[in-house]
């Protein structure tokens, strides 16, 4: 692929917005969860989580082990890789409108739950790479050719070997490509073939990853327990409902202020936009009922892939970092607004910018809270150390 001037401008704008959004992390990134252990011992350890490609990448960039703490370099590299991946699909989804493309694609990072992913000193690189590769994989497969299905399957294995939750991003971008074709009035037969190709690439890659990698590498009671699927019996429906309610409680806990009504407004904007898109698509179209049904299915699927297959797990991980799909959903909402109201670009851009502003304020507050928590924990550890020394424990 050759980068034109619009691609270069898009990458510049996107990286500028990303730097503003992640500025506290780029200037001072605290140790988060697994970071401290890796900084102390220089170990890898991602393979046991079913993420061997993460081990491989850090082994290569560190020229072996022990791995070093090069923060914020992993985060910077991750954002750049994501920007490059998005530039590959910018023209298909947005044409020459690189400004709106930058604002919409920023929703992937501006996802309030993605703050946890970006906060890791090490994993921020591989998690961003996983999202980037999943987007490219979805795009490659959405072109009906046998070779593209093979390439997509390989890329699917790659992004699952980096971070499994990016599967939802693959699915939501597939929906984005479908709605793009609906707006461009592509034939139902072409849309169906491309969709089938994309689904095939995902399924083949997923089963190959599950059998050849996850089945052989995932170790530890924690990893094994959280990867179990709900048994197909009388408690199946009850388990799914329980998972949905648990994720809903997490949503409502994090997005519980008046300022965060802006995120809920995206859902209503999506519905209105899809109605407008349907009315435009079925005007003088012979496949009115088919396209109406397709758009309804797209709406339901976009909401499902906020959580995705995790609702079928016996003990899913209830943590913000697994909700990468929320960023994809936010992007999809903005994309539909863009398609529905192309003649009102200024209003759309103002709306998208306001969402980014709220998200940036939220992220700065979250980063400060993480930093304050780390300082508190550091203070407690220092006091314990001083007490131990004062009492004489450990002396010969």
Label each residue range with its predicted role:
Residues 194-272, 310:
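Membrane-lumen/periplasm interface segments of specific transmembrane helices
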Residues 47, 51, 78, 99-142, ...:
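Membrane-interface micro-motifs in multi-pass membrane enzymes
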Residues 147-150, 339-363:
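Signature aromatic-anchored transmembrane alpha helix within multi-pass, membrane-resident enzymes
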Residues 170-200:
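Perimembrane helix-loop-helix junctions
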């Amino acid at each position: 692929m050759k980068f034109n001037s619009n691609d270069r401008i898009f990458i510049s704008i996107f990286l500028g917005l990303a730097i503003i959004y992640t500025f506290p992390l780029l200037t001072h990134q605290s140790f988060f969860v697994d970071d401290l252990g890796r900084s102390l011992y220089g170990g890898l350890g991602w393979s046991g989580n079913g993420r061997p490609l993460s081990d491989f990448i850090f082994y290569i960039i560190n020229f072996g082990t022990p791995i070093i703490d090069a923060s914020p370099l992993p985060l910077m590299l991750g954002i750049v890789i994501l920007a490059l991946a998005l530039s590959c699909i910018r023209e298909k989804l947005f044409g020459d409108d690189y400004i709106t493309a930058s604002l919409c694609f920023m929703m992937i990072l501006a996802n309030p739950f993605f703050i946890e992913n970006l906060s890791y000193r090490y994993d921020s690189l591989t998690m961003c790479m996983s999202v980037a590769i999943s987007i490219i994989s979805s795009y490659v497969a959405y072109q009906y050719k046998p070779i593209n299905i093979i390439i997509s399957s390989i890329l699917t294995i790659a992004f699952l070997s980096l971070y499994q939750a990016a599967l939802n991003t693959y699915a939501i971008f597939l929906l984005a490509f479908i709605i793009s074709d609906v707006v461009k009035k592509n034939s139902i037969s072409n849309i169906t073939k491309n969709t089938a190709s994309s689904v095939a690439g995902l399924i083949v890659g997923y089963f190959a990853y599950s059998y050849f990698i996850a089945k052989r590498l995932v170790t530890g009671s924690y990893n094994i327990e959280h990867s179990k699927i709900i048994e197909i019996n009388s408690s199946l429906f009850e388990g799914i409902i329980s998972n949905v309610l648990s994720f809903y409680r997490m949503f409502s806990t994090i997005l519980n202020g008046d300022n965060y009504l802006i995120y809920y407004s995206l859902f209503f904007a999506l519905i209105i936009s899809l109605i407008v898109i349907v009315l435009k698509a079925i005007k003088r179209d012979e496949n009115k009922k088919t396209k109406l049904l397709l758009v309804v299915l797209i709406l339901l699927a976009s909401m499902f892939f906020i959580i995705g297959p995790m609702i079928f797990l016996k003990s899913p991980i209830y943590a913000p970092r697994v909700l990468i799909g929320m960023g994809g959903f936010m992007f999809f909402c903005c994309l539909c607004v863009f398609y529905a109201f192309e003649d009102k670009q200024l209003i759309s851009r103002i709306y998208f910018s306001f969402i980014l502003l709220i998200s940036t304020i939220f992220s700065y507050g979250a980063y400060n809270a993480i930093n304050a928590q780390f300082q508190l924990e550091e203070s407690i550890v220092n006091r314990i150390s001083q007490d131990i020394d004062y009492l004489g424990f450990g002396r010969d």
